[in-house]
Amino acid sequence: MEVKTFYNGNTMPQIGLGTFRVENDENCMESVKYAIEQGYRSIDTAKVYGNEEQVGAGIRAGFESTGIAREDLFITSKLYFEDFGRENVAAAYEASLSRLGLKYLDLYLVHWPGTNEAVMVDTWKGMEDLYKNNKVKNIGVSNFEPEHLEALLAQVSIKPVINQVEYHPYLTQHKLKLYLAAQHIVMESWSPLMNAQILNDETIKDIAQELGKSPAQVVLRWNVQHGVVTIPKSVTPNRISENFRIFDFELSDEQMTRIDGLNQDKRIGPDPKTFEG
């Protein structure tokens, strides 16, 4: 398992299981449990996904079936708009912990920047409070553009360790990627397979055939070779297993360049500059 190291010295697995649009049901629990059994050590959820209870149940089931300890897992959740504001962050964090059945998170993210800079900065100060009080291992952001981060970094004392954003071969986020690298902020992809749309791309399919791998494995490997943390979502056991098996091959420079050339600046999610929930 490859890991990324944050500027604070902590590490995060480079691949994890995403749970966006996964219902809060037994299917969710089983997929999290299965992922842990297959070797996943990072699980990503969020308050707004509405599935923290079953993600937590899957984590507990995974502990039971594998014998691994809590410190072997890296668990992420996220703060949503209704809990913005420094005074609301601690209660929102504790509520997520309660739903998950955990004592701490490895990573807590501000889910979106919103359109009010003062509120964004105030909210981040609540995140800093959690970190300074040793409630959470790492704090970060999601869907932040360079201008959001510039505004934030000018007014706070602790820098986010990570920025989880939409990133796939049709949205390569070149400017943002360079900015994050310069700031020593890790980049993470929340939609690496573009809701499966990218899997039908002819270039991706050609490269998959060249390597004897699946299109999904090619795209996830492209993420990893670009130094991006990636969290593909699936509830299908064979796909969960397949998505994890990306460390036994490499894309050539020529193959990487071909995939890089697919960029269309095409989003499947909201525009971070205007989205308000």
Model regions and ranges:
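Short, well-ordered amphipathic alpha-helices
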Residues: 53-64, 93-97, 127, 149
